[in-house]
Amino acid sequence: MDRTKTRFRKRGQITGKITTSRQPHPQNEQSLQRSTSGYPLQEVVDDEVLGPSAPGVDPSPPCRSLGWKRKKEWSDESEEEPEKELAPEPEETWVVEMLCGLKMKLKQQRVSPILPEHHKDFNSQLAPGVDPSPPHRSFCWKRKREWWDESEESLEEEPRKVLAPEPEEIWVAEMLCGLKMKLKRRRVSLVLPEHHEAFNRLLEDPVIKRFLAWDKDLRVSDKYLLAMVIAYFSRAGLPSWQYQRIHFFLALYLANDMEEDDEDPKQNIFYFLYGKTRSRIPLVRNRRFQLCRCLNPRARKNRSQIALFQKLRFQFFCSMSGRAWVSREELEEIQAYDPEHWVWARDRARLS
């Protein structure tokens, strides 16, 4: 019994201490009475706030720091900007390159990522005043167009020159064997029947007849050189009725330049063209004779005529656009137009 009494006494002392500790302090009661008298109560928050609170800073969100706010602002600005579309990488596709029987060969081909909108963006960045409506017409193109218009106006004022078209090439069937056909590329000749008629008309000229009769060794006028004369007539671009004696000798002289290495035989063309023959001019290499010949007015006239012939030869060469070479196939085609013509009998192989 004594033990239980002592336990109750101790418990009563402890409860008394607790009640005294819970009783409000008189100073605290006064502060509470003042706060309730006329001012609103303030709520006390036990959460810790990092850093000193400056005036003007809202301490309401305690967990949001200044760095977090800046990151949020930057993220908002980045969201407001339009997202840039990345250009797609060029793709590759497989296309059919060759089909042989039942087998098909594929070839890998690169697909270009350039789109029409890229051309529009490029034209929009041009200088002000440039019309971007045609995407392929740039400022440089306009300048070229102006220069071209000026050149066309100047060409209209000058007489137009008719140039001979360049020869084309076609594919013709050479051989047919069973189900296989062999193709051969063949050159289309520009020689027309009117060119043959102009050549035959010039053969009736007395000076040309005399020249062909004099060349018995065929060193200047064999069948291939004469066929080149017809080819040059077709390339010069003149009408058939305009070809005269001078054109025949110009073409023959140019053909000798292209095919022959000996320069002496073709010099006889000058003497037949200007009314002289080679036999009438003595081959004397005496200096006194050469000096007297230089002082002769007739010799001066001959030199001026030869210089004029060389000038005309160069003009005739330019009228053909420099195409003085003639293939063997084209010469055979020219001769095949009239194979019974007496000119084609002038063959050097028969003389030997």
From Swiss-Prot:
Residues 1-12 have a biased composition (Basic residues). This is Speedy protein E18. Residues 1-90 are annotated as: Disordered. The gene is SPDYE18. One of its GO terms (molecular function) is protein kinase binding. Belongs to the Speedy/Ringo family. Residues 16-39 have a biased composition (Polar residues). Residues 76-90 have a biased composition (Acidic residues).
